[in-house]
Design a protein with these regions (language model features):
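Conserved single-residue anchors adjacent to enzymatic active/cofactor-binding motifs
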Residues: 1-212
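Short, charged alpha-helical interaction segments and adjacent helix-coil junctions
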Residues: 2, 75-80, 177-292
Length: 292
């Protein structure tokens, strides 16, 4: 399928949110988090999100993953296709929920484990950063020493990604190349030669698109997002036009008020000022009181 959107939430959840393909999710996580064979994620348990309704505002339903790294590390993956200015605040909010929900009432803080938020973005977000992958922790602003390793927030900006060498590709780069949609099937097949998980992902994609029900659901979701973009664009244009008109009106009124004040100071009668400025008699009388 041409222009297939691999960030479509229905497809993304089928690919990385299904325990039948948890080996792919492990590959994605271990790659993004730069885990080697000695400390990699070995198993994952998916949170039950089957009943979560799809939103039509471009904020794709969250794919929540609970990853078991033998120490209980929690991981949350979120896909965002529509530009969202408060992405940092949103990510921090969901990170805090993930972190706090580890403890039951009365439990000890020492039971808290590391929580990692991964944001996969289809738009440029961090204006001051050139790299496609940026990681944030809690640091001392003077010494840059880390306060704790319990918080880790990742931003993966797909538009910034460029594959430099197909022959020396890391697992993280292979996955971002796949999700970015920038590379052809032939190029992905070449990538799959060094990253078997991508080969399996491409094969699943073909199976997904051959399923009429799945494909129809995918197309309906894509249409909903396109409609959202169209509506927001129309509302924005209407809002700008309305704002411009309101601004012009407000500016003219301020200018007329200043003119009226100057005329009052010169002793011009109220009727003449009304005719000259368009302000009401009540407005002029109020200005007379104000300047006395």
């Amino acid at each position: 399928m041409e222009n297939f959107n691999r960030l479509n939430d229905l497809y993304f959840k089928k690919l990385l949110g299904d325990k039948k393909r948890k080996n792919l999710t492990l590959s994605f996580l271990n790659g993004i988090l730069n885990k080697d064979d000695e400390n990699c994620f070995t198993d994952i348990t998916f949170l039950d999100k089957d009943n979560e309704p799809l939103t039509l505002d471009g904020k794709l339903s969250k794919l929540d993953i609970r990853a078991d790294l033998n120490d209980g590390t929690q991981v949350d993956i979120e896909v965002q296709v529509c530009p969202f200015k408060l992405m940092a605040e949103r990510s921090l909010y969901y990170w805090s929920k993930m972190y706090s929900e580890q403890l039951e009432k009365g439990a000890e803080y020492k039971k808290l484990k590391k929580a990692i938020a991964i944001n996969l973005l289809a738009f440029d977000y961090l204006e001051d950063e050139q790299d496609w992958h940026n990681i944030y922790n809690l640091l001392n602003v003077k010494s840059y020493n880390k306060l704790t390793d319990h918080i880790e927030i990742h931003f993966l900006e797909l538009p910034k990604f460029t594959l430099k060498d197909m022959r020396k590709i890391r697992v993280s780069e292979a996955w971002i190349a796949y999700f970015s949609g920038k590379y052809s099937k032939e190029e992905l097949e070449e990538i799959a030669m060094t990253t078997p998980a991508i080969k399996e992902a491409v094969e699943f994609e073909d199976t997904f698109l051959q399923n009429k029900i799945e494909r129809r659901a995918y197309e309906q979701r894509e249409k909903a997002i396109r409609d959202y973009y169209s509506y927001m664009s129309a509302f924005k244009e209407e809002g700008l036009e309305q704002g411009l008109q309101e601004g012009i009106t407000l500016g003219m009124k301020k200018a007329n008020i200043n003119t009226a004040i100057n005329l009052l100071k010169l002793g011009v009668d109220v009727d003449t000022i009304v005719k000259g400025t368009g302000l009401s008699i009540q407005d002029i009388e109020a200005l007379k009181i104000k300047i006395k």
